[in-house]
């Protein structure tokens, strides 16, 4: 049984920008763990809400609704986006938010995705090209799983992701240290 966000949280005071984003948002479910220390709020929105705004919303709910209680609020968002969105246009618009979310989870995976190239040879195919490093090869599956969770599950789109690797560009720091090591052996 869904409720409009404002019906579910009528007393919540939010910034004007955030308020506007929630006009077409529904709360589809609220659940808690057995101890009532963690609450999950499931949202369904017709417009994208960037992760930083989701975090602001979690904070506002925690501070205003559950003040003075040790309760962690987690919002699980999903989207019903218009046909104007394709996986490519979604990534163009939502990439910073995707990176913010990944950065909160893993700085290592964030840096790999941030420096990766994304190419769409077809509307539902993404070629994700990363530097050929041991770290990239061991973390590729996690990055793909994360992207699929966001694009396919959260946003309801079909996308197949294919990894590929490129020879890493030599950094000036690596080159300088190799030259210094070479001079030390002469």
What spans do the regions from the language model cover?
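Intrinsically disordered, low-complexity basic tails and flexible linkers associated
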Residues: 1-183
């Amino acid at each position: 049984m869904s409720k409009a966000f404002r019906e579910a949280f009528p007393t919540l005071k939010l910034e004007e920008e955030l308020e506007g984003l929630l006009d077409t948002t529904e709360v589809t479910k609220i659940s808690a763990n057995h101890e009532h220390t963690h609450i999950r709020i499931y949202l369904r929105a017709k417009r994208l809400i960037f992760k930083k705004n989701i975090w602001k919303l979690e904070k506002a709910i925690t501070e205003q609704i559950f003040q003075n209680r040790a309760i962690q609020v987690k919002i699980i968002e999903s989207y019903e986006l218009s046909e104007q969105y394709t996986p490519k246009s979604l990534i163009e618009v939502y990439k910073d938010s995707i990176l913010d979310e990944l950065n909160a989870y893993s700085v290592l995976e964030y840096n790999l995705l941030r420096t990766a190239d994304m190419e769409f040879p077809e509307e539902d195919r993404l070629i994700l090209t990363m530097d050929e490093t041991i770290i990239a090869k061991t973390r590729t599956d996690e990055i793909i799983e994360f992207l699929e969770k966001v694009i396919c599950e959260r946003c309801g789109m079909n996308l197949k992701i294919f990894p590929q690797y490129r020879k890493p560009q030599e950094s000036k720091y690596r080159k300088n240290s190799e030259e210094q090591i070479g001079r030390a052996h002469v």
